[in-house]
Every structure is written in structure tokens, then in C-alpha cells.
């Protein structure tokens, strides 16, 4: 596709008759599958049957998508109240990660209770997978030319030594923008490496998951400050408020669980 003489990538991957298949969905799906592979591999090593995470994903992913969409729609209600038919249209984005995380955690707690396994054990195993999915998923935002930052010059982007396909895709309606999707994606990939390394440290059960929440939230807080499409509540960026809250809650949970003797088991224990 050409836009203002700057070559750009088409958000539609393939056309199946009258039905377009968007890169956004393909990329999100890829993130889910790779995350599932990573979790089942580690789960088997720690005595968790392979079908446990397959079953969890089949339940948690639809619920997470539902919560992610509900979260987004709630904070953009002024638009969706006037365009109710668009509420279910997620083909071109409009999923809020924090909403999806809330849905996934609720599902995980109920699933673990029903299966008679430790939620914290499942959460620890899944933590790198969740972050990997988020790192990959941000490239769906890239294809949709959304979740970007403020205006910049092409010279600025070239100064970051980015490949042309990224620079060109950040050219929207005659203006270049901060590739905030890339900043967050790289931060998340670094977090995946950190979490995989911390598996060998044998942290107390639950603390790998809290480390994920802290790491992701720190990166999201700073990246969100660069974005121009933040969900707002008055003067506050919702994602920044949530990020601060998750860091504080995670630290409190780590301290309280240790003091109350609820974190005696280690990551590698059955």
C-alpha cells in the first residue's frame, strides 16, 4: 500500500472472499500459541499435565478478550454509546491489556480451584508466556498503526536505526509518530528473558508472577506517557494508574505472604 508516497504494510493479511483476515488477529493468535507452547513445556517439567494449560487457554483466552474489550469500551463509552454496533468489532484493535489481565486472573483462580491445583503454581509457570504474548501482540498494534506516541520527525526515527518498514508504518496521515509499540515490545521481550532466568533461582511460589506484574507495569507506565491514545479518566491515564496500583499491590502481596507463611513453597516444589 502507498500512502503519500511512503510504502506501508496492509493491515489485511488475506482476503477470503468478502471476509478480510487482519494481521492483528493473526499476530495475537501467534502470541497465544507460542505462549501456550512455553507454558506446557515448563508445566510438564514440573508435573503439570500438558492438557491442563491447553484447557486453561481454551477457557481463559475468550474470557480475557471479552474483559479486554469491555474494559476498553467502558472508558470509551462516549463513542460506543453513539456507535453501539461497533462494540463487538475487535478486528482492528480496541483490546485493553489490563482488562484482559483481570479476566485471565479471575479465570485462572476459578480454574485452579476446580482442578485442585495451586493457582500460584499455574501463575508462575504462565508468567513468561503471558509476557511473551504481550510482546508479540504489540506488533498487531503496529500493523494497525495504533497505540503510537506523539509526533516525531523521520530523522528522529532514522536516528534510532530502525528498519524502513517500521519507520514507514509510523507515517500516518502525513505525520511520523513514536513507535511506542516497539518500546513496549522490546521491554516485554527483555522481561521474558528475565523471568526465564529467575526460574532457575527457585523463588517462592507466586513471586515469579508478581515479578512479571512489576516488570510489565514499570515499562507500561513510562511507555504510556508517550502515547496519544491513552484511555483517560479525567486528567489521569488509566494505564498509568493501573500500573502504579499493580506494582504496589504486588510488593504488598510479596511481603504479606512471606510474613504470614503463605509463601513457604518454592517454584520448583511439587
UniProtKB/Swiss-Prot annotation:
It is found in: Cell membrane. Pfam families: LGT. It is a multi-pass membrane protein. It comes from the Bacteria. Catalyzes the transfer of the diacylglyceryl group from phosphatidylglycerol to the sulfhydryl group of the N-terminal cysteine of a prolipoprotein, the first step in the formation of mature lipoproteins. Keywords: Cell membrane, Membrane, Transferase, Transmembrane, Transmembrane helix. The lineage of its organism: Bacteria, Bacillati, Bacillota, Bacilli, Bacillales. It comes from Bacillus cereus (strain ATCC 10987 / NRS 248). A 1,2-diacyl-sn-glycero-3-phospho-(1'-sn-glycerol) binds at residue 138. PANTHER family: PHOSPHATIDYLGLYCEROL--PROLIPOPROTEIN DIACYLGLYCERYL TRANSFERASE (PTHR30589:SF0), PROLIPOPROTEIN DIACYLGLYCERYL TRANSFERASE (PTHR30589). Belongs to the Lgt family. One of its GO terms (biological process) is lipoprotein biosynthetic process. Its main location: membrane. One of its GO terms (molecular function) is phosphatidylglycerol-prolipoprotein diacylglyceryl transferase activity. Its EC number is 2.5.1.145. The gene is lgt1. The chain crosses the membrane at residues 19-39, 56-76, 92-112, 116-136, 178-198, 206-226, 236-256. One of its GO terms (cellular component) is plasma membrane. Pathway: Protein modification; lipoprotein biosynthesis (diacylglyceryl transfer). The keyword Transmembrane helix applies. This is Phosphatidylglycerol--prolipoprotein diacylglyceryl transferase 1.
Amino acid at each position: 500500500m502507498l500512502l503519500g508516497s511512503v510504502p506501508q504494510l496492509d493491515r489485511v493479511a488475506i482476503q477470503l472472499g468478502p471476509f478480510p483476515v487482519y494481521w492483528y488477529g493473526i499476530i495475537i493468535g501467534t502470541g497465544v500459541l507460542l505462549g501456550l507452547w512455553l507454558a506446557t513445556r515448563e508445566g510438564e517439567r514440573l508435573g503439570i499435565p500438558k492438557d491442563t494449560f491447553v484447557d486453561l487457554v481454551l477457557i481463559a483466552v475468550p474470557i480475557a478478550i471479552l474483559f479486554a474489550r469491555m474494559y476498553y469500551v467502558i472508558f470509551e463509552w462516549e463513542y460506543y454509546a453513539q456507535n453501539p454496533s461497533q462494540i463487538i468489532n475487535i478486528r482492528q484493535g480496541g483490546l485493553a491489556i489490563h482488562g484482559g489481565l483481570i479476566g485471565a486472573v479471575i479465570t485462572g483462580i476459578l480454574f485452579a480451584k476446580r482442578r485442585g491445583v495451586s493457582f500460584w503454581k499455574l501463575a508462575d509457570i504462565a508468567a513468561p508466556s503471558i509476557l511473551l504474548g504481550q510482546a508479540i501482540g504489540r506488533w498487531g498494534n503496529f500493523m494497525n498503526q495504533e497505540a503510537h506516541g506523539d509526533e516525531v520527525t523521520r530523522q528522529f526515527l532514522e536516528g534510532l536505526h530502525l528498519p524502513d518498514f517500521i519507520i514507514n508504518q509510523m507515517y500516518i496521515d502525513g505525520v511520523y509518530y513514536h513507535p511506542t509499540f516497539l518500546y513496549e515490545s522490546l521491554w516485554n521481550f527483555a522481561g521474558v528473558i528475565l523471568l526465564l532466568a529467575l526460574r532457575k533461582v527457585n523463588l517462592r511460589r507466586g513471586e515469579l508472577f508478581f515479578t512479571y506484574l512489576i516488570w510489565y507495569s514499570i515499562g507500561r507506565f513510562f511507555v504510556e506517557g508517550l502515547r496519544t491514545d491513552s484511555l483517560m479518566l479525567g486528567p489521569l491515564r488509566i494505564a498509568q494508574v493501573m500500573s502504579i496500583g499493580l506494582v504496589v499491590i504486588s510488593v504488598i502481596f510479596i511481603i504479606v505472604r512471606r510474613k504470614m507463611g503463605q509463601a513457604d513453597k518454592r517454584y520448583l516444589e511439587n
